């Protein structure tokens, strides 16, 4: 718009990460790392309960102290949300703080219900996506207050609609959250995975997306090799243009033996893609997950595997990794990486899926 002054600037993810690390360092001057959970590059949770008496400050004064320190050392304006639990702190920042002059939102269970039970849209709330919002709207539920009322009148219906996720939906409708900072810090997954996902910049056709699926699998396999890991299965998730309101496609394929072999994994994942993806709907998101990854260890070949061919492929993988490490990720590519629909070269210049 002509009447608004603004700057058009390219995103610089590497710079953002450097500033994020600096700001985290500022927080460590006041709060121990055990009481901080980094949620994203620009957001973290802090349990400051035991620090209020130490610094002789109220919760709001503590937030202001941290915000002032960030401003003084980086020139960046911070925003804070204060809540009696993690969920309320998040909502206080996401919804309340942006409408307050000092950028500090505050909520407890009662004020949450008073201020936000009628708030719209529902997708403003943490963990409620547009699809969940549309699903609820189909039954006349448009606010958190509506969800709270439904939990009293027909809780079984919510569980039938959303399964185990209904428990979290109901808790959040009432402003409750059972997870504490200690739970986050003590949580360790029994199974580990490695994933590669991206949002496409336009609708991709079935064949164009097949090229991207092969590229992403190739990158995932080399990541496994570089880390000395193998997997026994891969999950593929495909999401479509939201205007078609089509459910995402999802499938998992298992390998006869744990593997990180490029040809085996690329061909198998492409076959899975061609089996589960809708060839007639524009594709916008792709995610590939290597499940139950474990350290590679000693590789024992079966009677049905060509050990010489496998060793040759492994030497090729290691050579590719060495070239990329020395000369850059785009120093060596497959021919398909030069296709117009390829995202390989652009993503190699990104950090965490964002422009570096």
Predicted regions and their residues:
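Acidic, metal-coordinating catalytic segment for phosphate/diphosphate chemistry
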Residues: 250-251, 255-356
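Short, functionally important structural connectors and interaction interfaces within domains
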Residues: 33, 96-99, 108, 114-120, ...
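Gly/Gly-Pro- and Ser/Thr-rich, intrinsically disordered tail segments characteristic of DNA damage-repair
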Residues: 1-171, 308-356
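DNA-contacting surface of Y-family translesion DNA polymerases
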Residues: 124, 134-280
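Short, charged/polar, Gly/Pro-enriched secondary-structure boundary elements
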Residues: 52-55, 244-245, 294-299
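A glycine-rich phosphate-binding loop feature that marks nucleotide/adenosyl-phosphate handling sites
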Residues: 84-87, 171-174, 230-241, 283-294, ...
